[in-house]
C-alpha cells in the first residue's frame, strides 16, 4: 500500500503503524494552539507499548495500572488474546517510557477453577500502595457470564500475588482503594450499575478489612443531557493525595451518533472526608485526537488506569489505553491541574445518607 504526499509527486510506502503515529504526533504539534486550557501533553513517542512489543502472542495491550517502585516504573498491563479474554502482565522500565522489560508469560492470569468470577478474564487494574499493609492493593475487574465485578489482590513484588477475592457484586468496575484509612476504615471508589438504573455514577464505599464493604455513597453523578459525561462516568487512575485534596481523574462517556466517546475530567475531594467533593470540572480536559486513540478495537477511547507523581518536580505521568489497542503516555504538572481546579465551581453538597444497595 502506498500513500501519496501532498507536497511531493512521489509516493512513499507506509512502513508500519508506528511511523504513522509519529507523523500524526508531528502534525498535532504543528496545529494552531487551542484556546482552551491544555494541561495534558502526549509523549512524542506514543504509543509506548503495543502487542508488537510482547514476548508472546497477544492481540492488544492497553489499560495499564502504574506505580513507581524505587527507581523502576512498573506497569501492570491488560493483555487481550484472540479469544477476547484478558490477563495482566508486568512491564518494567527505568525511565517509564522505553526499554521495557516484559514478563515472558502472563504475570496475573485468570484462575476460574478457584475464582469462577474470572471465567472470562481479568481486566483494568488500578494499583495503590497501602502503607499500613506494606503492600500494593490491586483493584481489578473480574469478568464472567455473571457480569463484571470488582476483585482485589495484593502483592509486594509484582512477582507473586494473593487474591482477596470479589468485594462487590456484578455489575461493578472502575475501582481503586485509597492509600490510607479514614478513621478505622479503608475506602474505595467504584462504579456499580443496577438493573433499570438511570445512569452509571461514581460511588464511594468503606470497609474495616478490605473484605466487607458498606456505607455506600454516590460521589459523582453522570450529568445526563448534552454534557460530555452524560451517560456514564468512572474512576480512571487511583485517587492521588495532594496538599489541596484527593485529586480524581475520571472518564466520562457520551453516546453519540458515531458511538460512545470517552473523555477525561477532574474532581477534587476533601483530604479527611472523601465523601465531600470540593471541585469538579465542567469541561473535559483530555479526549481522543490521535489515530491510536480514535481507531482501534474500540474507537474514540482514552482510558487511564495509572498515574505516577514525581514529588520532586510535580510532574504527573498518566498511562492510558488508546482505543483499547495500545498503551500511551501523557504528562501534566500538578500545580497546573490544581490551579485549574481552583477555578472550577464547587458542586452543591448533597445531604449525605448511607446506602445499603446501589439501586
Regions of interest found by a model, annotated:
Residues 10-11:
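Polybasic, lysine-rich low-complexity intrinsically disordered segments
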